[in-house]
A protein has these predicted regions:
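Walker A/P-loop
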Residues: 17
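Hydrophobic anchor at the beta1->P-loop junction of P-loop NTPases
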Residues: 8
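NTP-dependent small-molecule kinase module
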Residues: 1-2, 22, 26, 72, ...
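P-loop (Walker A) phosphate-binding loop of NTP-binding proteins
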Residues: 11-14
Length: 176
């Protein structure tokens, strides 16, 4: 049986953290960020983990965070942008709850991410490299149960769209 978590996935700048916090508040649920699970365990920020241990170690820590999610139920979870993009990860996330892909125009996503700062996967990459990264991740994101376009929308409007998509999906399941 699938846990009743709501799991937000998407590229950097999609709004997973800000939307996740608001969504959790609206649903009366706890909010969990996989990056927070990692930083709490390691005692250092994500950029520092990348700098000192590299991406490979960070991805290992993400795998541990996914395992920790198995203990969660009824929560709103925001994943790191690359977390679902490993073999078998999206399948695991789908078993832990309803996975919602927050998608958007790539230029807008990158602009949001740059404004937020401290993005190791964005630093020192050309626009072409960022686009290639997005295109490589997109097939994984497409495996989400639901997809919500965030282009041109603030967090409140995205939350409204996510809630509507969740209601529609719940109603469709009830009809089966």
């Amino acid at each position: 049986m699938r846990a009743d978590n709501v799991i937000l996935v998407g590229f950097m700048g999609a709004g997973k953290s800000s939307v996740g916090r608001l969504l959790a508040r609206r649903l009366g649920r706890c909010f969990v960020e996989t990056d927070d699970l990692i930083t709490a365990r390691e005692g250092r920020a994500i950029p520092e983990i990348f700098r000192t241990h590299g991406e490979t170690r960070f991805r290992e820590l993400e795998a541990e965070a996914v395992e920790a999610l198995r203990e969660k139920s009824g929560e709103v979870v925001a994943t790191g942008g690359g977390l679902p993009c490993r073999e078998g990860r999206m399948q695991t996330l789908r078993a832990l709850g309803t996975v919602v892909w927050l998608r958007g125009d790539l230029g807008e996503l990158v602009a949001r991410a740059r404004r937020a700062g401290a993005r190791p996967m964005l630093a020192e990459r050309t626009a072409a490299e960022v686009e290639a990264l997005y295109r490589a991740r997109e097939p994984y994101y497409r495996a989400a149960h639901l997809s919500v376009d965030t282009t041109g929308l603030g967090p409140d409007k995205v939350v409204a769209r996510v809630l509507a998509a969740l209601r529609d999906a719940h109603a469709a399941r009830a009809l089966r």
